[in-house]
Structure formats: structure tokens, C-alpha cells
UniProtKB/Swiss-Prot annotation:
It comes from Rattus norvegicus. It is a multi-pass membrane protein. Its main location: membrane. The lineage of its organism: Eukaryota, Metazoa, Chordata, Craniata, Vertebrata. GO terms for cellular component: neuronal cell body; plasma membrane; receptor complex. At least in the brain, more precisely in the pars tuberalis and the suprachiasmatic nucleus. GO terms for biological process: adenylate cyclase-inhibiting G protein-coupled receptor signaling pathway; camera-type eye development; circadian rhythm; negative regulation of insulin secretion. High affinity receptor for melatonin. Likely to mediate the reproductive and circadian actions of melatonin. The activity of this receptor is mediated by pertussis toxin sensitive G proteins that inhibit adenylate cyclase activity. Possibly involved in sleep induction, by melatonin activation of the potassium channel KCNMA1/BK and the dissociation of G-beta and G-gamma subunits, thereby decreasing synaptic transmission. Belongs to the G-protein coupled receptor 1 family. Keywords: Cell membrane, G-protein coupled receptor, Membrane, Receptor, Transducer, Transmembrane, Transmembrane helix. It is found in: Cell membrane. This is Melatonin receptor type 1A.
């Protein structure tokens, strides 16, 4: 990231590399959708008026999906933010002013803004993923016990 590796940022995120990253993200997205087509977990859900992932079709697949598409990314992003925060604290506590480049106020504001976006993203997606884990634990028993309003609210 820019805050931790500001000298390498321009090289890592050049226009050419950024296009490669976008292509990679779209490719990984298409690959991630393929198992849904194999397991039959994409179905129309009249509660949300949309074709969506059906959590009760396969418990193992639902758990894997939640772990690899929500839990692991949250852990990675949290680790990265912890590294950034440690750097921010080190820069603020530094006694020698010229030993390393200082953190600019704009960089700190950008960090806080990105962190707030991350927290809001996690808060928005957590209910749906936790409901998925609950349903996956015992689909026949738990799926009917999830209130419909809670399920619908977790999508929005």
C-alpha cells in the first residue's frame, strides 16, 4: 500500500499493472462463480426478488464460501490495517525528525477513510455470512428458524 511502501507505489500501481490487476480480479471473479454453477446453488429467491446463492443446498460449500470469500479476506485486510496503524504510531512517536520520511496529514486522512470504508463493508456483509454459517450448520433445522425479515435485511 501507499502508506507502508510509498517509494514503490508508482511502480507497483502503474497504468499497465493496474489494468493487469483489473483483468486478474475479473478472472478470479469468474472462477469463483463456476462452483456455483456446478453445485446448483444459484437459484431464484422470491424473498429478495433475485437469483442468489442458496445457502441450504450444500453445507460444506456454504462454509467454504464464507471462509474463503469473507473470513480470509477480512483477516488479510485487518492484518494490513494493523501494519499501517503500527507505522502511523511509529511515525507519530519518532524523536528524530529527519530519520525517515514523515507521514503526511493527507495520508493519515486517507488511511482513516479507507478504514471506515472497510469497517462498513464488513458490517454490511457480516450478517449475510453469519446467517450462511448458521444455516450450513444444520440446513433442515436452521433454515426455517431464520426470520424472513432478518434474511431479507441481511441482503440490503
Amino acid at each position: 500500500c501507499y502508506i507502508c511502501h510509498s517509494l514503490k507505489y508508482d511502480r507497483i500501481y502503474s497504468n499497465k499493472n493496474s489494468l493487469c490487476y483489473v483483468f486478474l480480479i475479473w478472472t478470479l471473479t469468474l472462477i469463483a462463480i463456476m462452483p456455483n454453477l456446478q453445485t446448483g446453488t444459484l437459484q431464484y429467491d422470491p424473498r429478495i426478488y433475485s437469483c442468489t446463492f442458496t445457502q441450504s443446498v450444500s453445507s460444506a460449500y456454504t462454509i467454504a464460501l464464507v471462509v474463503f470469500h469473507f473470513v480470509v479476506p477480512m483477516i488479510i485486510v485487518t492484518f494490513c490495517y494493523l501494519r499501517i496503524w503500527i507505522l502511523v504510531l511509529q511515525v507519530r512517536r519518532r524523536v528524530k525528525p529527519d530519520s525517515k520520511p514523515k507521514l503526511k496529514p493527507q495520508d493519515f486522512r486517507n488511511f482513516v477513510t479507507m478504514f471506515v470504508v472497510f469497517v462498513l463493508f464488513a458490517l454490511c456483509w457480516a450478517p449475510l455470512n453469519f446467517i450462511g454459517l448458521i444455516v450450513a450448520s444444520d440446513p433442515a433445522t436452521m433454515a426455517p428458524r431464520i426470520p424472513e425479515w432478518l434474511f431479507v435485511a441481511s441482503y440490503y
